[in-house]
Amino acid sequence: MAKQKIRIRLKAYDHKILDQSAEKIVDTAKRSGANVSGPIPLPTEKAVYTILRAVHKYKDSREQFEMRTHKRLIDILNPTPQTVDALMRLDLPSGVDIEIKL
C-alpha cells in the first residue's frame, strides 16, 4: 500500500471524547509504522434553535438552544497492512462519528 493516503474525519458533540479518539488513532498509526498528519481541528458547526417559551402568547419571550458539532481530520500517509489491521480493531466511543476515505 505504498504512496497511498487514508483520510479519517471525526465528528462528535463532545470535544473531549473527540480528542481522546483522535489521540488513540494517531498513537495506533504511529506504533504500526505509518506517517501521521494531524489531528487537524476543523471549524465547529453551530446549530441554533429558537423556540417560544409560552404556548399561546408572549412572543417576545423566547429561548435559544444550540448544538455544536466538533470535527477533526487525520491523514495517515503510506499506511502499512498492519496499520489498516490495527485501525480496524480499534475500539472507539459510541459518540464519535468516523468517516474513512482511502
UniProtKB/Swiss-Prot annotation:
Keyword Nucleotide-binding (UniProt): no
Keywords: Ribonucleoprotein, Ribosomal protein
GO terms under cellular component: ribonucleoprotein complex; ribosome
GO biological process: translation
GO molecular function (one): structural constituent of ribosome
Gene3D superfamilies membership: Ribosomal protein S10 domain (3.30.70.600)
Function: Involved in the binding of tRNA to the ribosomes.
HAMAP family tied to this protein: Ribosomal_uS10
Name under which the protein is recorded: Small ribosomal subunit protein uS10
